[in-house]
Regions:
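Exposed, interaction-prone extracellular/peripheral surfaces
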Residues: 1-177
Length: 177
């Protein structure tokens, strides 16, 4: 109950908090691999998926953070966009994704998975990993970091993919290019 507003209006006013406002989404983009036509195509699609997802989440009022092992063309550092919110952040987000370069020998993406530690409700963090990498070791590492949280892995592919076994509570979405 908002007592100050109730007193001003003379009628009971209750603040409602939408569940989506408490949700935070971390989008992690893996840009390892360059030079092979299929890898380049899949990395480009991965950027498109990650950026579009972030924009839609921001427009829905959800707080977003985005990280990638892809190097920023200006700083030479891995792309990092700590928590942003609101439609006013869309331009900065699009610029960050546009400046992330795919390359060989990048830092392993596992180092960019959020831990969720230090948050009041660690279950309020949803992590979405966008990667063309279909190795089981990567999927296992992501599931291990997720713990009991339901996280999502999006795998862009071309022509065919090999269905991986389910690991933990991570859901996997195969995205045909």
């Amino acid at each position: 109950i908002n007592w100050k507003a109730t007193a001003k209006r003379g009628q009971l006013l209750v603040n409602l908090h939408e569940a989506t406002l408490a949700l935070k989404v971390a989008v992690v983009l893996d840009l390892e691999g360059l030079g092979v036509q299929q890898a380049d195509l899949l990395n480009e699609e991965a950027v498109r998926i990650a950026c579009t997802l972030c924009v839609r989440l921001l427009e829905a009022g959800i707080k977003v953070s985005a990280y990638s092992n892809g190097l920023d063309v200006h700083s030479g550092q891995p792309m990092a966009l700590p928590e942003v919110s609101g439609p006013g952040s869309v331009l900065a987000l699009r610029k960050a994704f546009a400046c992330a370069l795919a390359a060989n020998g990048l830092e392993p993406i596992e180092g960019f998975f959020p831990s969720g530690e230090g948050q009041r409700d660690e279950n309020s963090l949803l992590c979405v990993l966008v990667t063309r990498d279909q190795r089981e070791s990567r999927a296992r590492a992501f599931a291990q970091r997720a713990g009991q949280r339901e996280w999502l892995q999006i795998i862009p592919y071309r022509d065919e993919y090999e269905e991986m076994p389910q690991f933990g509570t991570v859901r996997r979405l195969y995205w045909e290019v």
